A protein has these predicted regions:
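A structural signal for multi-pass alpha-helical bundles of membrane permease subunits
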Residues: 3-271
Length: 271
């Protein structure tokens, strides 16, 4: 574990150092000072990709958590086929990202896609710049629900049944019991899922890379900050500038995580 942690820190330091350098495709570098950061802060593409990433996270995080929590509450009850339902909802997590992208590209196809066939429309789900980012976020929600649900199920099974029996005696059941008992006792799990999903959503890459073509007119409205890093570092060979973009993302994640850690004191109950 310590070896793995040291490798992570080493790579972080190396990335930060590279952000101050002009790095070539073959690893040769020369110190460039704050040139990469000056360029980055003046680059509208960086801010557009950061905005795209925030928009994606605003949809993916709350919806994936809310839907997963509702499913977990229902699947935590005694019901026929409970194990099968759990497996079905968790399935997207174990499916290869390439297969997920292929299925959703077919669903979203404006000419012969299933969604347009059902709706009887010709909506350009992933090529219309106004709605493409929403379409990509929907895939993200669908893909992560199963993972969130499993975590919530684990948390629900740790809640003693005595609380619910006492609530029944007092006449508090159903929705009232959920908000008075389930949610407060599950708040540490909800907080963990929230923090990890915010970090995960801000690092979205594979969905954009596999669903959106380079020639797609909506690409600039959907490309994430990590996708932009990939473009500069690996496609354009500008690893110094790519490292500066990653440092920006790291700073954003750290700030948001600190705010979440401060805010959790008001609503997370550990006792």
């Amino acid at each position: 574990v310590s070896s793995a942690a040291s490798d992570v820190y080493k790579r972080q330091v190396q990335t930060i150092y590279q952000s101050f350098c002009k790095v070539g495709s073959f690893g040769d570098s020369s110190f460039a000072g704050f040139a990469n950061y000056k360029k980055m802060f003046a680059d509208p593409e960086v801010w557009q990709s950061l905005l795209n990433t925030f928009k994606y996270a605003i949809i993916e995080v709350p919806f994936s958590i809310a839907i997963a929590l509702i499913l977990a509450v229902f699947l935590n009850r005694k019901m026929h086929g409970r194990t099968i339902y759990r497996a079905i909802f968790f399935l997207p997590m174990v499916v290869a990202p390439a297969a997920v992208a292929m299925v959703w590209r077919w669903l979203y196809n404006s000419q012969f896609g299933l969604l347009n066939h059902i709706l009887g429309t010709k909506i350009e789900w992933i090529s219309n710049p106004k709605i493409a980012w929403i379409s990509v976020a929907i895939i993200g929600v669908w893909s992560i629900i199963g993972y969130n649900m499993v975590l919530f199920l684990a948390g629900l099974q740790e809640i003693p049944k005595d609380y619910y029996e006492a609530a029944d005696i007092d006449g508090a059941s159903g929705v009232r019991a959920f908000f008075k008992i389930t949610l407060p006792l599950l708040s540490p799990t909800v907080f963990f899922v929230l923090v990890t999903r915010v970090i995960g959503a801000l690092q979205v890459f594979d969905l954009v890379y596999m669903v959106m073509d380079i020639s797609n007119p909506a690409l600039k409205k959907t490309e994430s900050i990590v996708y932009l890093f990939y473009q500069y570092s690996f496609q354009n060979g500008n690893k110094g500038y790519g490292s500066a973009i990653v440092v920006l993302l790291l700073a954003v994640i750290m700030v948001l995580t600190v705010f979440q850690m401060i805010g959790q004191k008001k609503w997370v109950h550990y006792n």
